[in-house]
Amino acid sequence: MHEFQFVVFSNPVAGREAEYNRWYQEQHLPDVVKVPGVVSAQRFQLADNSTMAHRYLALYEIRTDNIEAVMQDIYGRVGTAEMPMSDALDIEGVAMHVFAATGPKVCK
């Protein structure tokens, strides 16, 4: 079984941050975690004053021997009843990347 991180950078539509945060935390993360192979999801907000293009980050931990199949499953659910999207998400500005673990997790 291989480990991956699906990394998603995003922003809300101007003036709709509360709606975006509510949808992302209460609807979207639980929907993505229902996909077989996705074992956890967590969101982060930019904590410093840097001028990054994105203010929000979502990390999805995936364990699978077939990352292409898991990603195809995720993308296939987007916009369906299994994974409804919110128009409070600035979809044009979303950046998504999949990273494969290069070694074991180091913990304290």
Q: Which residues are covered by each model-predicted region?
A:
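Macromolecular interaction modules
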Residues: 1-108
